[in-house]
Amino acid sequence: MTIKLGIVMDPISAINIKKDSSFAMLEEAQKRGYELFYLEMKDLYMEGGRAFGTMRPLTVKYDYADWYSLGEVVDQPLSSLDVILMRKDPPFDTEFIYATYMLERAEDEGCLIVNKPQSLRDANEKLYTAWFAEHTPTTLVTRRADKLRAFHAQYKDVILKPLDGMGGASIFRMKEDDANVGVIIETLTAHGSQYCMAQTYLPAIKDGDKRVLVVDGEPVPYCLARIPAQGETRGNLAAGGRGEARPLSEADWAIARAVGPTLKEKGLIFVGLDIIGDRLTEINVTSPTCIREIEAAFDVHITGMLMDAIERRLAKA
């Protein structure tokens, strides 16, 4: 039986196929003979309590000039598909949440959603690390300026970041003698109206912020270390960091194995852990990336691991 796979993503016309993990997934699925269907968020809708999609058949090829083609529009229930990859990038806003409810209706009718819609809502990429606090830096989440100031006074060198950012946006390092503590706190909490996260600064960032991929609970044995540019605190590639693929360290393995079973149980089939030194800083569940960079450096088939996991789950359904 041919597997029908849908993908919800940002416009495919604007992606960089050399780096795009979603495109790598589509290539592997197509190689296996899956039928591919393309959707954007605007193509999801509900009617009469059922979730539908205005979708188009999709074919892909690794060609910088002509990497995809779309067939005629098909309007049909999302549950007509066997599996849907939810690969829409953050922001994780109310529109994203509404989309997860629609995907959950399809899940109720037997469609496998990667990642599980309820777990996408439950697992905020920064806050969810609190469930594994023994592996994280010392962390405070609050909107109160006095608590943030006290945290800074106690630990001297801290990182402040919003709970909904991506790509290193709005991440601030506050050293002991920082003259901008007040304005940084005001900015990130929107004058006390929004939560933000404070963590102790990890000097190991100079060796890279490591992206460790976990596929259906199993760690990929290689990671991508994102090394900050000169004078930068952030390793994110989007913030000018340099990527360097490397094998997992013992600490990476320990963290990934500690977190993996819970991720699998929650239906979080494709996840990116962010690890600095031996500390877990984020659990990325919405649209993790770095497949291309790791596969280019090592003999590892991450998209194959993912499709194998999907096929195993479909076989059990």
Residue ranges and their predicted role:
Residues 3, 9, 14-18, 231, ...:
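ATP-dependent carboxylate activation and anion-phosphoryl transfer catalytic cores
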Residues 13-141:
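Conserved N-proximal alpha/beta basic substrate-recognition cap immediately N-terminal to
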Residues 22, 145-146, 153-157, 167-255, ...:
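Phosphate-binding site of ATP-dependent enzymes
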Residues 30, 107, 152-153, 264:
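Anion (oxyanion) recognition and catalysis
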Residues 117-120, 226-228, 276-279:
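Short glycine-enriched loops at secondary-structure junctions
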